């Protein structure tokens, strides 16, 4: 009753096992056998190549070496050129590269730690050097202070010994020491006074020489100035004389032209007029000016002869007939 298939009661574990073992697996077995036969035929076709292909072997070796050098990851250029990898593989490759960035970050962090450790070591060395320098300076100062203190103590002890010796010495020795000290002081004072006197005498002579040199320079400057003034005055006088000589020469040339013109009277002039021209005092004056016997004075207001006298004193009075 419990083992029949049509029973409505609950099935036992043994019934379930019997049902599962007793199922028809013919279709599944056929599919497995067909897949096994197909794989065996493909394997036989692949293994049928008995000879070694050198080209394929070289390419395989090159691919293997390249893969080892590149950590088994193809380059981006190879991914772009060869489309058989597909977008899925490229995305997986990029994801894997991003996942591998932690290696670079870890390396950079290690380098930063190394650099910081080096800087800390350098700072520690600098601090040690500074501490050593400060320590050496402090030691030198301490030694110098101890040396000064020792010298002061020695000087103090010498003074105490000298005082004790004076106190314990007889009066004669004390007087002798005081007298000797006084004589030495007088000698030093005399020597200093002599040096001061010599120095004062030297300074006096030096000041006198400087003052004398200053006065001499002033006198020489005045002499040079007076000489230069005389030279300038002589130049001015010479220049004035040259100008006067030029003017006198020009005036004499003009007077000569007038004298010649009055002597060569035109034929249209009457003899009476010609006689008056030749006998006139003006023609005689022009003749004397042309011969440089009469000149114009420096102020240009009168005629003078060679002696410097005014020629009007020698001319006849034109109004004598009317007086």
Curated annotation (Swiss-Prot):
Cross-link (Glycyl cysteine thioester (Cys-Gly) (interchain with G-Cter in ubiquitin)): 8
Traits of the deletion mutant: Cells are unable to grow on solid media with oleate as a carbon source.
Renumbered ranges of motif WxxxF/Y motif 3: 141-145
Effect of residue 280 to F: Abolished interaction with PEX7
Keywords assigned by UniProt, alphabetized: Cytoplasm, Isopeptide bond, Peroxisome, Protein transport, Repeat, Thioester bond, Translocation, Transport, Ubl conjugation
Localization of this protein: Cytoplasm, Cytosol; Peroxisome matrix
Motif (WxxxF/Y motif 2): 102-105
GO molecular function: protein carrier chaperone
Annotated GO CC locations: cytosol; peroxisomal matrix
PTM comment text: Monoubiquitinated at Cys-8 by PEX2 during PEX20 passage through the PEX2-PEX10-PEX12 retrotranslocation channel: monoubiquitination acts as a signal for PEX20 extraction and is required for proper export from peroxisomes and recycling. When PEX5 recycling is compromised, polyubiquitinated at Lys-19 by PEX10 during its passage through the retrotranslocation channel, leading to its degradation.
Chain positions of motif WxxxF/Y motif 1: 89-93
GO biological process, one term: protein import into peroxisome matrix, receptor recycling
Cross-link (Glycyl lysine isopeptide (Lys-Gly) (interchain with G-Cter in ubiquitin)): 19
Task performed by this protein: Coreceptor required for the peroxisomal import of proteins containing a C-terminal PTS2-type peroxisomal targeting signal, such as 3-oxoacyl-CoA thiolase. Acts via its interaction with PEX7, promoting association between PEX7 bound to cargo proteins and the PEX13-PEX14 docking complex. PEX20 along with PEX7 and PTS2-containing cargo proteins are tranlocated into peroxisomes by passing through the PEX13-PEX14 docking complex.
Subunit structure: Interacts (via WxxxF/Y and LVxEF motifs) with PEX14; promoting translocation through the PEX13-PEX14 docking complex. Interacts with PEX7.
Domain notes: The WxxxF/Y motifs mediate interaction with PEX14, promoting association with the PEX13-PEX14 docking complex.
The family this protein is said to belong to: Belongs to the peroxisomal targeting signal receptor family.
Protein's name in the database: Peroxisome biogenesis protein 20
Species: Komagataella pastoris
């Amino acid at each position: 009753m419990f083992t029949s298939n049509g029973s409505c009661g609950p099935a036992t574990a043994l019934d379930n096992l019997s049902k599962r073992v007793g199922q028809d697996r013919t279709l599944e077995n056929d599919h497995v056998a067909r897949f096994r036969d197909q794989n065996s035929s493909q394997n036989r076709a692949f293994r049928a190549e008995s000879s070694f292909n050198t080209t394929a072997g070289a390419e395989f070796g090159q691919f293997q070496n390249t893969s080892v050098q590149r950590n088994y990851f193809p380059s981006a250029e190879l991914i772009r050129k060869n489309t058989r990898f597909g977008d899925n593989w490229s995305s997986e490759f990029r994801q894997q590269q991003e996942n591998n960035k932690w290696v670079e970050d870890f390396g950079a962090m290690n380098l930063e730690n190394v650099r910081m450790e080096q800087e800390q070591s350098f700072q520690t060395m600098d601090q040690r050097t500074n501490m050593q320098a400060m320590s050496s300076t402090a030691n030198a100062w301490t030694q110098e202070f101890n040396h000064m203190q020792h010298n002061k103590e020695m000087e103090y002890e010498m003074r105490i010994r000298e005082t004790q010796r004076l106190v314990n010495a007889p009066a004669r020795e004390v007087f002798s020491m005081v007298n000797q000290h006084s004589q030495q002081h007088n000698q030093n004072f005399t020597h200093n006074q002599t040096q001061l006197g010599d120095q004062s005498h030297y300074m006096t002579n030096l000041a006198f020489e400087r003052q004398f040199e200053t006065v001499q320079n002033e006198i020489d400057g005045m002499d040079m100035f007076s000489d230069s003034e005389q030279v300038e005055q002589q130049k001015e006088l010479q220049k004035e004389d040259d100008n006067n000589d030029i003017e006198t020469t020009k005036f004499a040339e003009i007077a000569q032209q007038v004298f010649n013109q009055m002597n060569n009277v035109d034929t249209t002039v009457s003899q009476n007029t010609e006689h008056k021209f030749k006998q006139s005092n003006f023609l005689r004056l022009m003749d004397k000016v042309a011969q440089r016997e009469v000149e114009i004075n420096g102020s240009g207001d009168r005629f003078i002869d060679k002696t410097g006298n005014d020629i009007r004193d020698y001319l006849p009075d034109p109004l004598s007939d009317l007086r």
